[in-house]
C-alpha cells in the first residue's frame, strides 16, 4: 500500500515571498506584502460595552498582527474593512483585489474566494485569479467545476504537448473578456504578470486541474496536464508527490527512481528532515521491517508532531504489528481533529480490523470510501475485510476498483491473484504476472508469487523465488552460503517465508536443511506451531524418534486440538512399533498388562485435555495406543498355549 495521505491539503500554494531567480519549488504561502499606497489605514468609530466611544483602526499591519497570534476571525474582519474601502472606486485596482484574495487564501476562506472571483469573472481575466479560483473549488471538493473552468486562453501555447483538456472561451465571450481587460491599467496587468511568473502560477494551476481530473478518474487528461506543468517547471515538489500518490510513474522509471533515492538516503544518515525520515520509513515498510518503521515514525511524530503525510504509513505499520491500542489512540485523535475527511475513519476501520471485529470494520471502511470514492487504500482495505467475511466476489470488485484508481500499483493485482489462487491457477498466475511487472523488486510480491507456485506444485520454481526473497530481505548477494544468510537479523514478519523454504526443502528430501530453516523460524516466533510440528516430522523421517516426540509434544502443548499434528504423531508411533519385533522378547508366564501399564493412567483421547501452564505432555510410545496392547495379549495367549503343550511332550518322552 502507498504511504502519502490522501486527505492532506494536497494542492500546491506558491509562496508570495521574494524568490528572485531561485528555482526552488514553492510549497507554502507566506503573508502577502503590500505597498503603502494600497489598503490605507481606515479608522472606524466603535463603542465599548460601557457605552464609551473610540476609533478602531484597520490596517495591513493590524491584519498581520492578528495572523501572527492566530486570531483569524479578527484578521478577516480587518481585511474586510480594508476591502470595503475600494469597492466603490470607479476604476478598481485589480492588484489590490488580488492581494485581498491572497489574504483570504491564508485564512482558508474558500467559499468567499470563489464568490469574489466569480462576481467579477476575474478568473477569465488573469492567470492569478484563475489559479486561486481553481484552488478554492478544489478545496471545496467541486472537482467537476475545476475541470469546467474556461482558462485555456490564459495558458501559453506549447506545441510539444498537444491540445490540453482545458476549456477555452468562445469567440463572443472572448471579445467580452478583452473589453473587461481594457478597464484595468497596463501597469496593473503587468504587475500581475510579474507576480504570476515569479510564483510560477501556470504550472501550479495545471497541477490543481490535473489532481481534479484524478479525483474524477480521468488519468489520461491528468497526465497531459502534468506533462504540460513539467514542461514549464520541472522542479515542482508537488508533482513528485502527486505522481507517487496516484502511481502515475511507469514501473521501470519508478524502480530507477527508487534505486537512486535509496543510494541518496545513505548520505543522509542522522538527518531529521521529515522528507528523509518518511522515505526511510517507507523503505523499511516495503522490506517488511515494521518495527523499524514504527521507530522512525515515532521519531518523526516526536519532532514534528502528527505529520499529515506520514499518518497513513503509520496506520499501515500499526496494523501490520497488530498494535490495536496505538491504532485506537490515533483514531480518536484524528476523528476529534477533523471528522469530515476519510482518513480518520480509515484508521478506525483498521483498528477494528486488527482486533478481528470485521463487521464494525466493514461499516467504517464503507463510510470512508463513501466520503472519498478515489481513496485507493480504502478500497484495498475494503477488499481485505470482505475476504475475511468470505465474500470473495465483492472482495475482488474492491480490488478491481482500486486498480482503476492506481493502475500502475501492484497491490490490487497481487490481492486479486491471491483470491483466484484457490480455484483458478491460470487467472492467479495472470494477475500475479501483472503485479510482478509493476514491482519486480518488492519482496512481498515475490513471496506471494512463490506461494502461488507452491500451490501449483511447482516446487523448484517456488524454491528459487523464496530464496530470492530471502536475499532481498537480508540485502545479501546470492553467492553467500545460506548458513551465513540465516545468521543475519531478519524481521519477525518474515518467519512464514523461512517456514515455507523449509517445507520445500523437506519435500525435496533435504531434511537437515529444512530443520535449519524451521529452527530459524522458531527462534523468531517461539510459538510457531507449524514450524515446530514440521521439525518433528523431519526428525521422525530421519529416525530420531526422541527428538520427534519432543517437538510433537511442544506443538501439542501450544495447540492441543490440532488434528493434523495428532495424526502425524500417531503414524510415527505406529511406524516405530512396526519396527520393534515383539516376538523376539521373552515375557514371564504370569504377565499382567494391567500391572505394568495401569499406573500410567492411559487416556484414550488424551488430546482433549486442557493444556496446563507447564505444558501438555503426550503419553509415551508404549502406553499411547491400543493396537500395541492387542499385540501383547496375542503374544501372551500364544505363550500360554506353548506352556500347556509342554507337559504332554514331557510325558511322551518319559514313556
Curated annotation (Swiss-Prot):
Keywords: Cell cycle, Cell division, Cell junction, Developmental protein, Meiosis, Mitosis, Neurotransmitter transport, Repeat, Synapse, TPR repeat, Transport, Ubl conjugation pathway. InterPro entries: TPR-like_helical_dom_sf, TPR_rpt. Expressed in GABA motor neurons. It holds the Pfam family TPR_19. Disruption phenotype: RNAi-mediated knockdown results arrest at the one-cell stage of embryogenesis. It is found in: Cell junction; Synapse. TPR repeats lie at residues 44-77, 203-236, 342-375, 376-409, 495-528, 530-562. GO terms for cellular component: anaphase-promoting complex; anchoring junction; cytoplasm; synapse. One of its GO terms (biological process) is regulation of meiotic cell cycle. The keyword Cell membrane does not apply. Residues 1-30 are annotated as: Disordered. Pathway: Protein modification; protein ubiquitination. PROSITE patterns: TPR, TPR_REGION. PANTHER family: CELL DIVISION CYCLE 16,23,27 (PTHR12558), CELL DIVISION CYCLE PROTEIN 16 HOMOLOG (PTHR12558:SF9). Belongs to the APC6/CDC16 family. The APC/C complex is probably composed of at least 12 subunits: apc-2, apc-10, apc-11, cdc-26, emb-1, emb-27, emb-30, mat-1, mat-2, mat-3, such-1 and gfi-3. Probable component of the anaphase promoting complex/cyclosome (APC/C), a cell cycle-regulated E3 ubiquitin ligase that controls progression through mitosis and the G1 phase of the cell cycle. The APC/C complex acts by mediating ubiquitination and subsequent degradation of target proteins. Developmental role in early embryogenesis and the metaphase to anaphase transition in oocyte and spermatocyte meiosis and mitosis in germ cells. Required for embryonic anterior-posterior axis formation. This is Cell division cycle protein 16 homolog. It comes from Caenorhabditis elegans. The lineage of its organism: Eukaryota, Metazoa, Ecdysozoa, Nematoda, Chromadorea.
Amino acid at each position: 500500500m502507498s504511504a502519502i495521505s490522501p486527505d492532506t491539503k494536497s494542492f500546491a500554494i506558491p509562496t508570495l515571498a521574494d524568490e528572485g531567480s531561485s528555482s526552488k519549488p514553492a510549497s507554502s504561502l507566506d503573508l502577502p506584502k503590500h505597498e503603502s499606497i494600497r489598503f490605507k489605514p481606515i479608522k472606524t468609530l466603535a463603542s465599548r460595552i460601557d457605552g464609551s466611544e473610540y476609533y478602531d483602526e484597520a490596517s495591513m499591519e493590524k491584519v498581520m498582527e492578528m495572523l501572527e497570534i492566530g486570531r483569524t476571525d479578527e484578521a478577516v474582519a480587518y481585511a474586510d474593512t480594508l476591502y470595503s474601502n475600494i469597492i466603490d472606486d470607479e476604476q478598481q485596482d485589480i492588484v489590490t483585489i488580488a492581494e485581498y484574495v491572497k489574504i483570504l487564501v491564508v485564512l482558508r476562506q474558500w467559499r468567499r474566494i470563489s464568490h469574489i472571483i466569480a462576481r467579477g469573472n476575474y478568473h477569465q481575466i488573469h492567470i492569478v485569479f484563475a489559479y486561486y479560483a481553481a484552488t478554492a473549488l478544489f478545496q471545496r471538493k467541486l472537482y467537476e467545476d475545476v475541470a469546467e473552468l474556461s482558462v485555456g486562453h490564459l495558458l501559453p501555447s506549447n506545441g510539444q504537448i498537444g491540445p490540453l483538456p482545458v476549456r477555452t472561451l468562445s469567440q463572443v465571450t472572448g471579445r467580452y473578456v478583452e473589453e473587461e481587460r481594457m478597464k484595468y491599467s497596463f501597469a496593473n496587468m503587468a504587475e500581475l504578470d510579474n507576480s504570476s511568473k515569479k510564483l510560477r502560477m501556470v504550472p501550479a494551476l495545471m497541477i490543481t486541474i490535473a489532481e481534479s481530473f484524478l479525483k474524477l478518474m480521468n488519468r489520461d487528461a491528468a497526465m497531459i496536464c502534468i506533462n504540460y506543468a513539467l514542461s514549464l517547471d520541472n522542479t515542482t515538489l508537488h508533482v513528485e508527490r502527486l505522481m507517487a500518490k496516484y502511481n502515475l510513474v511507469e514501473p521501470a522509471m519508478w524502480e530507477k527512481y527508487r534505486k537512486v533515492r535509496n543510494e541518496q538516503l545513505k548520505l543522509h544518515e542522522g538527518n531529521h528532515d521529515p522528507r528523509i525520515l518518511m522515505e526511510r520509513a517507507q523503505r523499511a515498510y516495503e522490506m517488511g521491517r515494521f518495527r523499524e518503521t514504527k521507530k522512525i515514525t515515532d521519531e518523526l511524530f516526536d519532532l514534528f508532531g502528527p505529520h499529515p503525510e506520514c499518518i497513513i504509513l503509520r496506520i499501515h505499520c500499526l496494523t501490520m504489528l497488530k498494535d490495536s491500542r496505538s491504532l485506537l489512540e490515533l483514531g480518536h485523535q484524528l476523528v476529534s481533529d477533523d471528522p469530515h475527511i476519510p482518513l480518520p475513519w480509515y484508521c478506525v476501520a483498521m483498528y477494528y480490523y486488527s482486533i478481528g471485529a470485521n463487521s464494525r470494520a466493514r461499516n467504517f471502511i464503507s463510510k470512508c470510501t463513501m466520503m472519498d470514492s478515489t481513496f485507493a487504500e480504502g478500497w484495498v482495505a475494503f477488499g481485505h475485510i470482505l475476504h475475511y467475511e468470505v465474500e470473495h466476489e465483492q472482495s475482488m470488485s474492491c480490488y478491481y476498483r482500486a486498480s482503476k484508481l492506481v493502475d500502475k500499483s501492484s497491490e490490487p493485482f497481487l490481492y486479486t491473484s491471491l483470491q483466484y489462487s484457490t480455484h483458478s491457477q491460470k487467472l492467479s498466475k495472470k494477475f500475479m504476472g501483472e503485479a510482478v511487472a509493476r514491482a519486480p523488486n518488492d519482496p512481498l510480491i515475490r513471496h506471494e508469487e512463490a506461494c502461488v507456485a507452491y500451490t501449483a506444485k511447482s516446487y523448484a520454481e517456488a524454491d528459487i523465488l523464496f530464496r530470492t526473497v530471502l536475499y532481498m530481505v537480508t540485502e545479501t548477494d546470492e553467492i553467500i552460503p545460506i548458513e551465513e544468510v540465516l545468521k543475519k537479523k531478519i524481521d519477525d514478519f518474515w518467519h512464514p517465508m523461512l517456514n515455507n523454504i523449509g517445507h520445500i526443502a523437506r519435500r525435496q528430501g533435504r531434511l537437515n536443511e529444512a530443520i535449519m530453516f524451521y529452527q530459524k523460524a522458531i527462534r523468531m516466533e517461539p510459538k510457531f506451531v507449524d514450524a515446530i510440528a514440521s521439525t518433528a516430522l523431519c526428525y521422525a523421517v530421519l529416525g530420531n524418534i526422541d527428538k520427534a516426540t519432543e517437538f510433537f509434544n511442544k506443538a501439542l502443548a501450544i495447540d492441543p486440538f490440532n488434528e493434523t499434528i495428532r495424526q502425524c504423531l500417531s503414524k510415527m508411533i505406529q511406524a516405530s512399533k512396526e519396527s520393534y519385533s515383539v516376538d523376539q522378547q521373552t515375557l514371564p508366564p504370569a504377565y499382567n498388562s494391567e500391572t505394568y501399564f495401569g499406573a500410567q493412567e492411559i487416556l484414550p483421547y488424551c488430546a482433549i485435555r486442557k493444556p496446563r501452564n507447564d505444558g501438555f505432555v503426550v503419553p509415551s510410545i508404549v502406553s499411547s495406543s491400543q493396537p500395541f496392547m492387542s499385540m501383547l495379549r496375542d503374544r501372551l495367549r500364544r505363550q500360554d498355549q506353548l506352556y500347556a503343550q509342554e507337559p504332554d511332550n514331557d510325558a511322551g518322552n518319559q514313556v
